[in-house]
Amino acid sequence: MNSSKITPQRLALSIVCSLAAGFCAASLYATFRHGFNGEAMMTFSVFAFWYETPLYIGHATPVFFCGLSIIIATSVVVLLSQLIISLRNREHHGTARWAAFGEMRHAGYLQRYNRIKGPVFGKTCGPLWFGNYLTNGEQPHSLVVAPTRAGKGVGVVIPTLLTFKGTVIALDVKGELFELTSRARKSSGDAVFKFSPLDPERRTHCYNPVLDIAALPPERQFTETRRLAANLITAKGKGAEGFIDGARDLFVAGILTCIERGTPTIGAVYDLFAQPGEKYKLFAHLAEESRNKEAQRIFDNMAGNDTKILTSYTSVLGDGGLNLWADPLVKAATSRSDFSVYDLRRKRTCVYLCVSPNDLEVVAPLMRLLFQQVVSILQRSLPGKDERYEVLFLLDEFKHLGKLEAIETAITTIAGYKGRFMFIIQSLSALSGTYDEAGKQNFLSNTGVQVFMATADDETPTYISKAIGEYTFQARSTSYSQARMFDHNIQISDQGAPLLRPEQVRLLDDKSEIVLIKGQPPLKLRKVRYYSDRMLRRLFECQIGALPEPASLMLAQDVHQDGQDHLSQQAAVTAALGLGDIDSLVNNGETPTQQNSDMNDEQDNLAIGIYAPQVSVEIDDVVEDANARGVAPVSSVPAEMAPALSAQQQLLGQIIALQQRYRPVSSNPIE
């Protein structure tokens, strides 16, 4: 089989033929320039133009210049005709071809490192060379399909986080994105947040999805609460589909009631419905208590149902996502908000949603709710003049989040609101398992940049091969006659074949990737690895300082226990330093009732970490006083007890400050 593409040999032959045709046309002009007569026809020669050239007669004549113009014009016409005929023959079965780097640079998809503003998908050369990087150009959304250990993290996700000039909300399944890129994001001016509700050390920032609804006017709260319920509560199995609407109505009524009570959190909704007793009695009581008409209506309807039906509603509500808030960690992480969604387009922000692979399925309702709520808020209004940053949703392990109906709809519209999606999955079958065929095609048709790394499933290679298309080639067949030894027949025909067959996709080497860009030919590129790329490695190694870890989150029971321990330590330290009873020190002219009331108020302040600022006591003075009373100093106690005693001395300073606050100033020392 011989390909019909234009080769240098064929191009040279075409030029020779076109020049020959032009020379003949010039000879005709030289012969018949005075008219078509019999004498001219008798003397015609194909070399007539040669006799008019300076090489033959020694000087240029007007006939020579006219003939030269005829040669050039004829050659161009012949070459264009041959090219058109060749292209028509080749387009008969397909025109698929690989894109050239030059045309991709001209289209704006290949950029030098210092001009990259969007995601990074690949590179035109090896890691040690100054090549161009592939970005998304005018395409807002992208899809990365790569199996495990194929390099999507080191080649796409981390380079994107290191270079993207805008706000990023990244699903960090392993927690490594925060460790590897958070310092770079912070040094570039980002406000960095780590939302990790199930972190073993409770180091997480907080986000309360109900606060946005509580801040809305009352007439809009019901609609937004219904949207929140649809995003959070999903049916688990076909048996739950008949009760999902009632379960969502219950959730809506619970949110409205908690907002009315001044506890706008999903944890408060869980506690509200987790109360013991008959559910119909609870709903009847809530209907009487609530002033919100929609909440009253829902609770009234629920109170009139049979106990079994109510049990089904509450069961579907819990299994659909609300039971996640039985975990104290989740309750605490959603009790307040440390960042505002309304600021994401106004100032650069990076939010890492950190969760371990084992907890991803468990915490998926919360992550799903956060993503969909941010999308909903972004689409409430067009970006203002001060909202100049784009928001990139980096969805790694997209499949495990479940069905995201809000994102499925928003992918067609959110680009106008400065929103971008990057979906990362292991194979196209992951979309088939979560979305129906229409939803899957919606994602594929709206992701303008699709990056594929070597995959072994059946669906993905077939999709890539069909998406790239076929090219036309010339097939040559030879047949021989049995009667005569040297008698044979040769037939040449145009046929089509895939530019890249499915089996070739499976054999793609570990350093290459295939990129499909809407409106452009397919592109084959080198993968990027940030740790070996000369530019990205420099950016990664420039990170300095500690990780921007949030403070350890305090749970509700911890606050109560810390308050009790705080007061116990005060009493213990007072006795150890020989200060006697606090009541006898503080009670100076006050009645016991007044003194106890004041001390109780002060103890409440101590329990929540608020201390009296009126008097400051230096620790050195406290130690001197302790030494005067015969108490062993810190230096004389065992080393393992020194930190504890130092903390107790600080508590003592606070106690003395309280004592001086509640007694008149006297020059006599306390005995």
Curated annotation (Swiss-Prot):
Gene3D superfamilies (UniProt xref):
P-loop containing nucleotide triphosphate hydrolases
Top-level taxon: Bacteria
Q: Subcellular localization, per the record?
A: Cell membrane
Which InterPro entries would you find in this protein's record?
Answer: P-loop_NTPase, T4SS-coupling_protein, TraG/VirD4
> Keywords in UniProt for this one?
Cell membrane, Conjugation, Crown gall tumor, Membrane, Plasmid, Transmembrane, Transmembrane helix
Q: Does the keyword Ligase apply?
A: no
Report the sequence similarity comment from the record. Answer: Belongs to the VirD4/TraG family.
Q: NCBIfam families from the entry?
A: PRK13850.1 (NF010424)
Q: What is this protein called?
A: Protein VirD4
Source organism of this protein record: Rhizobium rhizogenes
- Name the encoding gene, please: virD4
